[in-house]
Design a protein with these regions (language model features):
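Short carbohydrate-recognition loop motifs
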Residues: 168-188
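Beta-rich interaction/scaffold domains
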Residues: 19-120
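Extracellular-facing segments of soluble proteins and assemblies that are Gly/Ser/Thr-biased and enriched
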Residues: 188-269
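Extracellular beta-strand ligand-recognition surfaces/modules
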Residues: 249-260, 301-346, 352
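Extracellular polysaccharide-targeting segments
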Residues: 122-123, 266-281, 314, 333-357
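Bacterial Sec-dependent N-terminal signal peptides
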Residues: 1-30
């Protein structure tokens, strides 16, 4: 039996290696770093698969901005690195691999710390085969939510949009809502030590880390105000069997959902928090945590206060400089980052609101 398992895992790894090799040219068309002159940025640029986000102090100063990029070896970019452009609206760049066979289009956006405090979950688009949620500010600035859907696609490439852990439902408290479902990641997910994927939605970004999956979630976006409450509506049903990371059933226990928010200081050593430290890191100053996690067939209203972590406080100077981040996190399984969860656990959330000073 052990020998048979060895051959199965070997075959899976060989298949995965073949997939990676076949897509390697595309990996040679990446933006690695981005720089701009002066003190315009309040945070290091956030570079995702096809997007670069630049958090800036003033949008009036981006009308003649000339960002410089470093690329994967031999790749070229159009327009060329250092070209001055008007970033009052997002700009597009095309990166071409060294052999000329692969191209990747990037959207580069300049964002301010404009606050969006009402989340209706009406706005979602299908990107790369799965739902992506976003909100739009009064001025038209778009802020995207993140999820682990990209990781699920890696293990379940044939899934339809509604079969991903994070999707949109028509059955909201008012209109549409976000639907989060804990899913099995199949044989390939188990191979990498990630047998389940909890449905999640959070402020921040998601970058796949195959070796430490819990570090794939980069929680938080810049926030220059003091948050006081997070409120909204939820419905929740736990899956039938709670299992651990190895797939063993945990008797006499049920899964629970999780809704919480964390306000923390950002430093050069701690640019973000992830699934390994989002509730425990010493940089956390304020935290709001849902404690009433009961299962319910009807919508339940919640309002959770931000509480100060003992011995910590907000530095007003750093707050004005944008040195704090706010992470709002929704999950269908509270221990999903540790892969202890029940397949089928389902959380609906709607009409959420952030209050602040």
């Amino acid at each position: 039996m052990k020998l048979q398992n060895f051959f199965i895992i070997t075959a899976l790894l060989f298949t995965l290696q073949s997939c990676i090799k076949s897509e390697a040219p595309n990996a040679e068309a990446d933006i690695l770093t981005c720089e701009v002159d002066g003190n315009l940025l309040i945070r290091e640029p956030i570079i995702q698969n096809t997007e670069v986000k630049l958090y800036v102090t003033d949008l009036d100063k981006v009308k003649n901005l000339a960002p410089r990029f470093t690329l994967t070896q031999g790749a070229t970019i159009s327009p060329t690195s250092g070209t001055a452009r008007n970033f009052s609206t997002p700009q597009t760049y095309v990166v071409t691999s060294e052999d000329g066979n692969w191209q990747k289009t990037y959207k580069v956006s300049c964002l301010t710390n404009e606050i969006i405090a009402h989340y209706h979950f009406e706005n979602a688009r299908i990107t790369d085969g799965y739902y992506t949620f976003y909100d739009t500010s009064v001025s038209g600035q778009e802020i995207a939510w993140s999820s682990g859907n990209a990781g699920f696609k890696f293990t379940n490439s044939n899934a339809k949009p509604d079969e991903f852990p994070t999707s949109q439902s028509e059955s909201g408290y008012r209109g549409k809502c976000v639907k989060l479902v804990t899913q099995s990641t199949g044989v390939l997910g188990k191979t990498f030590g990630a047998p389940i994927a909890a449905g999640n939605l959070f402020t921040g970004s998601f970058e796949i880390d195959l070796f430490t999956p819990a570090k794939s979630t980069h929680f938080g976006i810049p926030f220059k105000r003091k948050p006081t409450h997070l409120s909204g509506y939820y419905k929740y049903k736990a899956g039938e069997k709670l299992t651990d990371k190895k797939g063993n059933v945990i008797p006499n226990q049920k899964d629970k959902c999780d809704i919480y928010a964390v306000f923390y200081e950002v430093t050069s050593q701690v640019p973000h928090l992830d699934g390994t430290n989002i509730k425990t890191h010493n940089n956390i100053v304020l935290m709001a945590q849902l404690t009433d996690k009961r299962e319910t067939d009807n919508w339940v209203q919640f309002s959770i206060p931000f509480k100060t972590i003992k011995g910590r406080s907000i530095d007003t100077k750093k707050l004005k400089e944008g040195k704090y981040s706010l992470a709002i996190v929704l999950s269908s399984s509270e221990k999903g980052a540790d892969f202890t969860a029940a397949v089928g656990s389902t959380l609906y959330v709607d009409e959420m609101q952030l209050s602040y000073e």
